[in-house]
A protein has these predicted regions:
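A short helix-loop-helix "switch/interaction" segment in the helical subdomain of ASCE P-loop NTPases
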Residues: 185-187
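Long, low-complexity, Lys/Arg-enriched
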Residues: 1-183, 195-305
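Polyanion-engaging groove/track-forming segments
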Residues: 191
Length: 305
């Protein structure tokens, strides 16, 4: 079983708009532009509805996706499907042995884009689309799940909440089983968050180096994704186990505002002094989530370390 964590941006919506308007550079397949335009219109109507129920989306937007022959769309329609196809050059993008988790920004357009990516990943099959989940929710196998990342939006003053949410998703993915692999794909998504996601992936990799990997593909090289653009594996740094234990302890003290024990190792990197108090940086909030959350002194809660 492999869990694919894929930060999701707006590239698929941008492609659909360009394709439906007749942009010759976006003609990756013989699809009726009018059908793509109908799909866009249906997605916009669903997005403007206050309830935005998933069952309604499946019965309206997904039906339009099938009418637009989404099953045969070239993976280049989005950064997310391009990177998945590069890692899965043959067969369907998702099987019973996979979990595909699309990390969506905290905006209506971000959710819309992620659901459209899910439609392509699932080849229009509603049974392969789990729905819109919270970071702490269980990740079902054999399905594409959209996770809305709280605070991941242009109006946010920091990425602290978003890092904590993404770290929680990573922690839950690690908890799925001792033999299950986790691939983090960093080709698409909200650019400001990719660096934070990479840093958190290094903490996850430090915990389970045989299970965790990160990948990306170069954009705009002009080759067909159906010809299998090469997915490049990112070399990840690794913290020794003792440093991970110390990191969780130190960040827990900083979050609670308690005096540090011993010489600080992660001041400036994951926490900082703020007047006479301490607070976690955005990176620190993500690190602590990956490590299992706040550690309580005097307990044997190891967070799986």
């Amino acid at each position: 079983m492999t869990t694919y964590l894929v930060p999701c941006g707006l590239s698929i919506l941008n492609w659909m708009r360009a394709y439906s308007s007749g942009d010759p550079n976006k003609r990756y397949a013989n699809i009726d532009p009018a059908a793509v335009e109908d799909l866009l219109d249906e997605q916009e109507q669903w997005r403007s509805n206050e309830k935005r129920e998933l069952n309604v989306w499946k019965s309206t937007v997904l039906e339009k996706a099938r009418a637009a022959d989404v099953e045969h769309w070239d993976p280049r329609v989005s950064a997310e499907t391009s990177t998945l196809r590069a890692r899965r050059p043959g067969g369907p993008l998702i099987t019973d042995e996979d979990r595909i988790v699309l990390l969506a920004s905290d905006t209506d357009e971000g959710i819309s884009a992620a659901l459209c990516v899910a439609a392509v990943v699932a080849a229009g099959n509603p049974g392969r689309i789990d729905g819109i989940a919270e970071p702490e929710d269980e990740l079902p196998p054999g399905k594409a799940t959209v996770v809305r990342i709280d605070g991941l939006k242009p109006t946010s003053l920091s990425l602290g909440r978003a890092c904590e949410a993404m770290g929680t998703v990573l922690h839950n993915a690690l908890a799925t089983g001792p033999s299950e692999r986790i691939e983090v794909h960093l080709t698409g998504g909200y650019k400001a968050a990719l660096l934070h996601m990479l840093a958190m992936t290094e903490v996850a990799y430090s915990r389970f180096p045989s299970r965790v990997s990160a990948h990306y593909i170069f954009e705009g090289d002009g080759r067909s994704a159906t010809g299998h653009d090469k997915a490049v594996r990112i070399g990840l740094r690794r913290f020794p186990r003792g440093q991970l234990i110390r990191m969780r302890e130190e960040l827990s003290y900083a979050k609670r505002g308690l005096p540090m024990r011993g010489t600080p190792m992660f001041e400036g990197l994951a926490w900082e002094k703020y007047g006479d108090r301490t607070r976690l940086t955005d990176f620190g909030r993500g690190y602590l989530a990956v490590l299992g959350g706040t550690w309580t002194p005097g307990t044997n809660d190891g967070g799986g370390l």
